[in-house]
């Protein structure tokens, strides 16, 4: 049927476009803010007029790109690839005017206006506007993680996450904050950071209305209302709402006291106890000079019982 054929052709183009979007680390559906342009492999077999491309050394891929040398089996594939070099965007949206380099990208973009979601997950009935989005979603059900890091072996379900992870090893941080210059390995990390400058808190609690800058902070807060305690102590089974609380509790079993006092050497299990203890030292050591009115500390070895009412400068004058 014509409709089914069109869907199949669109899905084939979707697979081609996915190769462009995913390698870049973001799915932007062919729009202008692409950061890294990768080549796609179209499925059609149409010839296009124009100057014959340079020959390729590979007989199976006789059409080579004169700009980057990549070879293709079909001239039509090369013609589409050439747009990654020329920047040509021949497909325009009649609704908003945005232009795209591939027809499949325009088709997907058009669904942002129509709300159409023709691709349904057979597992959970969730619907998607693009076949590539459905394929990525289905990995949540199957557990498939096809992208493996050659450096550490960690695997990823999405190539965008894989591309961002690689920057941990390479040290690349291409996203710089325009406010403070701090650089990040992923655009999402930059977006979260920028909220520290803008004060934006887009995540609101449905129960009490408290707003948060990070979705993770909202998720933790929600446990106050739900009573959820997902973090369990492996020793005694006690459960906690936050991982930090579990870490503090675990020290009751291990005896670890990671906070030492530089004044007296006493060690503490909790940072709050350590801070309170330090303040006690400060209160004992700060005095107001009766001569000049300045604060001063007791000299080494002195105690409150032997302290004078004057600082060392006034006492010696």
From Swiss-Prot:
What is this protein called in UniProt?
Zinc finger protein 771
Domain of life where this protein originates: Eukaryota
Role description = May be involved in transcriptional regulation.
One example of a Gene Ontology biological process annotation: regulation of transcription by RNA polymerase II
Q: Which residue ranges have biased composition labelled Basic and acidic residues?
A: 33-49
Instruction: Identify the GO cellular component terms for this protein.
Output: nucleolus; nucleoplasm; nucleus
Disordered as annotated region, ranges: 1-63
Compartment annotation: Nucleus
